[in-house]
């Protein structure tokens, strides 16, 4: 874990100590089979009883001459800071929120609105619209905006928890996939709940780059813990 990731998580240590019963943390490794890239994430979140919640996510990637090797010369990929408010009407949870992503030479501002409908004890569905404004600090590339839509469906059975997710993005200025301004992703997640622990695996389908129509498989494995 690099110094920036450690510093980001350190900022929330008082929260973990004083509100340990309501904190969720997870760590995750990611591998892309075509680009041979490795990424790692550390995440921590908390929601208060009044509905206000916030989270910090720190992402690093393998660098140096062997980016295809996990945990090799880790470099900072970016950080995300989220604040949100959640309230319920019946079986639907509504969540307006705002995400700030910071990286090397850019910042992205992401207001969003999410709704999650609990159908019964096993099934739930959700959707989120997010507007993204990409602000660049250099003159090489202009700022850009992206409209993004996420949809989810989840099913719980005994200790298993399955989630399928679909993502659609449309940019204003720059290409995202196959020479066009549209892009999409699919993701399937399986988690197994063991008391407060939740190990999980994910398999996704994502684009390789913005110029070709090639797709690649994204593998993720991680573990979460709820205090």
Swiss-Prot record:
One GO process term, biological-process aspect: oligosaccharide transport
Tagged with keyword Signal: yes
GO molecular function per UniProt: porin activity
Signal peptide interval: 1-22
Highest taxon of the lineage: Bacteria
GO cellular component, one term: cell outer membrane
PANTHER family (alphabetical): OUTER MEMBRANE PROTEIN, OUTER MEMBRANE PROTEIN-RELATED-RELATED
UniProt-recorded name of the protein: Uncharacterized protein YiiY
Gene that this sequence comes from: yiiY
